[in-house]
UniProtKB/Swiss-Prot annotation:
<feature type="glycosylation site" description="N-linked (GlcNAc...) asparagine">
    <location>
        <position position="211"/>
    </location>
</feature>
<feature type="domain" description="Ig-like C2-type 1">
    <location>
        <begin position="19"/>
        <end position="110"/>
    </location>
</feature>
<feature type="glycosylation site" description="N-linked (GlcNAc...) asparagine">
    <location>
        <position position="135"/>
    </location>
</feature>
<protein>
    <recommendedName>
        <fullName>V-set and immunoglobulin domain-containing protein 10</fullName>
    </recommendedName>
</protein>
<feature type="glycosylation site" description="N-linked (GlcNAc...) asparagine">
    <location>
        <position position="34"/>
    </location>
</feature>
<feature type="glycosylation site" description="N-linked (GlcNAc...) asparagine">
    <location>
        <position position="357"/>
    </location>
</feature>
<keyword id="KW-0325">Glycoprotein</keyword>
<dbReference type="InterPro" id="IPR036179">
    <property type="entry name" value="Ig-like_dom_sf"/>
</dbReference>
<feature type="glycosylation site" description="N-linked (GlcNAc...) asparagine">
    <location>
        <position position="376"/>
    </location>
</feature>
<dbReference type="InterPro" id="IPR003599">
    <property type="entry name" value="Ig_sub"/>
</dbReference>
<feature type="glycosylation site" description="N-linked (GlcNAc...) asparagine">
    <location>
        <position position="269"/>
    </location>
</feature>
<feature type="glycosylation site" description="N-linked (GlcNAc...) asparagine">
    <location>
        <position position="147"/>
    </location>
</feature>
<feature type="disulfide bond">
    <location>
        <begin position="40"/>
        <end position="96"/>
    </location>
</feature>
<feature type="domain" description="Ig-like C2-type 2">
    <location>
        <begin position="129"/>
        <end position="217"/>
    </location>
</feature>
<feature type="glycosylation site" description="N-linked (GlcNAc...) asparagine">
    <location>
        <position position="330"/>
    </location>
</feature>
<keyword id="KW-0393">Immunoglobulin domain</keyword>
<feature type="signal peptide">
    <location>
        <begin position="1"/>
        <end position="18"/>
    </location>
</feature>
Length: 529
């Protein structure tokens, strides 16, 4: 930066120089608005014997003892030129000339190049889009794109620099340049980008600096909704409503209020507001009613507004109202309470006595269920047990009656079960028997339904038994082939059709004749049964 300034200064001096560099004996830099004195370097030892005058760019601008003295330009007794309130027009090549009193010629004693430095002035910065707070601080929304711009006036030239002072940056410089305005931008700005931003302008000739600072904050609302909760207060008669909304900057404003009250009873009068991340309100339970609805609203300065709410509900435990246990066994009864707000405290009682964990009773809480196990049940354990639930709105209980049966009382049940199994087994055996002999049963039923009418039945009997009927049945004529004949038994079976008797006789005779011709068997007539 120093090298650049030196080069600019050198070029500037060249542009304003009217004589060669060898002729200039001194370079003087003055600041606009200040006073400066130019020395006449080679003035005589006896200054009182000479007269002085000063020229600027070849023109006389000041003389000693003028008739109308100038406040802006004046010459001292020793020939020094004093310039008050430097202006840009005062810049140029000044020559100090002297003349002996009574003389007629002027002698140039020294040549001085005066350069006027102005500024920097009018340093201004702009950060947008941003919003001013009452204290002058700017804030932007997290994730937005922010533009930074800085400008100033300076003669002959200037250097501009953007810096930021925050804890997240090791290098404070953000941007540097000689052009005005000097601008840069931050895309998707984050909380780490907040800090104090400074724009510094430095005159390249006088090294004079000027700056302007602006504190910038990055605001963001919590991403989640507020959370509403509750707990018992320090006093037994109080309940504490808790509203929390963490994760934003700056902290939000939280407000508790009653949205919808119960049909009867006084209102909660809960309206309370405070700028905090957690707002706790203590309410006396006497003014709380079933059905009251309360709401917590969180408002953030960025314009984000979110809320949470809940409706107060009295407890309502549920479960089976009847339980049966066998004497000498263990029994577990349970109840469930899920509807209460704030959540109720649930316990087991018997005869208004609180049941706690002992060798006889085992109480287990597996939300939302609360179980009671009675070990080694006896007849004395029979009775009513209460599942008692209570919250700030009130209390309710579920009655569970335990019926205990003794071992003697179960004898009849065991006998009944045995008889039932026996009857079932007999039925299975009878069914299987009937199924396996179904053909015989069906034939017997068929013959029992016939009338006294008769029909002829032809039965074939093995010829090996012919000796038995040899005397009782007339023998048929022998066959020439020498084989045994088949014995034919003809039975008379009742028939309802009397007209078919003659036909049956003819058919029998025909059958006998056919069998006689058959060969190796014989036909024998046997009286019908």
């Amino acid at each position: 930066m120093m090298i650049t300034s030196a080069v600019v200064l050198y070029l500037l001096l060249l542009s304003h120089q009217t004589v060669s560099e060898e002729q200039v004996q001194q370079f003087v830099i003055g600041e606009k608005g200040n006073n400066t004195t130019l020395h006449c370097l080679d003035h005589p030892v006896n200054a009182s014997s000479v007269l002085y005058q000063w020229k600027k760019d070849g023109a006389v601008v000041a003389t000693q003892n003028p008739p109308n003295p100038s406040v802006h330009l004046s010459i001292s007794e020793n020939g020094f030129l004093r310039i008050s309130g430097l202006q840009l027009i005062d810049e140029g090549l000044y020559e100090c000339e002297s003349q002996a009193k009574g003389g007629r010629s002027w002698q140039t004693l020294s040549k001085i190049q005066l350069t006027i430095a102005a500024g920097p002035t009018g340093v201004s910065l702009d950060i947008s889009p941003a919003t001013f707070l009452n204290n002058g601080t700017l804030f932007v929304h997290k994730g937005s794109n922010v533009n930074f711009s800085c400008s100033s006036e300076s003669n002959p030239s200037q250097n501009l620099t953007w810096t930021v002072d925050n804890l997240a940056s090791d290098n404070p410089e953000r941007e540097f340049g000689s052009k005005s305005p000097l601008a840069f931008s931050i895309t998707n700005i984050q909380p780490l980008d907040q800090g104090t931003y400074t724009c510094t302008s430095q005159n390249t000739l006088s090294r004079r600096t000027a700056n302007k600072t602006q504190e910038l904050l990055v605001y963001y609302a919590p991403e989640r909704h507020p959370e509403c909760s509750w707990e018992l207060g320090d006093k037994p008669s109080d309940v504490l409503f808790i509203c929390s909304w963490f994760g934003g900057y700056p902290v939000p404003t939280l407000t508790w209020q009653e949205v919808e009250g119960a049909a009867e009873g006084p209102t909660i009068n809960l309206t309370t507001s405070q700028q905090t991340e957690e707002l706790n309100v203590s309410v006396n339970r006497s003014i709380l009613h079933d059905g009251d609805k309360v709401k917590c609203t969180g408002h953030h300065v960025t314009g984000v507004e979110k809320s949470c709410s809940f409706t107060l509900k009295i407890p309502y435990p549920t479960g089976q109202p009847l339980a049966t246990a066998l004497e000498g066994t263990n029994i577990t009864i349970s109840c469930t309470e899920t509807s209460s707000l704030p959540p109720a405290k649930t316990v087991w009682k018997k005869n208004d006595d609180l049941i706690e964990n002992t060798s006889k009773y085992i109480v287990q809480e597996n939300r939302p269920a609360l179980t009671l196990t009675i070990v080694n049940v006896t007849k004395a354990d029979e009775g009513v047990y209460y599942c008692y639930s209570e919250n700030p709105l009130g209390a309710r209980e579920l009655e569970v009656y335990l019926n205990v049966k003794t071992s003697a009382g179960n004898g009849g049940a065991i006998v009944g079960i045995f008889v039932s199994v026996l009857v079932m087994m007999i039925g299975i055996v009878v069914g299987v028997t009937v199924y396996t002999k179904r053909d015989r049963i069906c034939i017997g039923l068929r013959f029992s339904q016939l009338d006294d009418d008769r029909v002829d039945v032809l039965s074939l009997v093995d010829s090996d038994e012919e000796e038995i009927f040899h005397e009782a049945v007339p023998r048929l004529p022998p066959v020439t082939n020498g084989h045994a004949t088949t014995l034919v038994e003809i039975h008379r079976i009742p028939s309802c059709d009397h007209e078919d008797i003659a036909d049956s006789t003819e058919q029998s005779d025909q059958t006998r004749a056919n069998l006689t011709e058959a060969g190796p068997q014989r036909a024998e007539l046997q009286p019908a049964v």
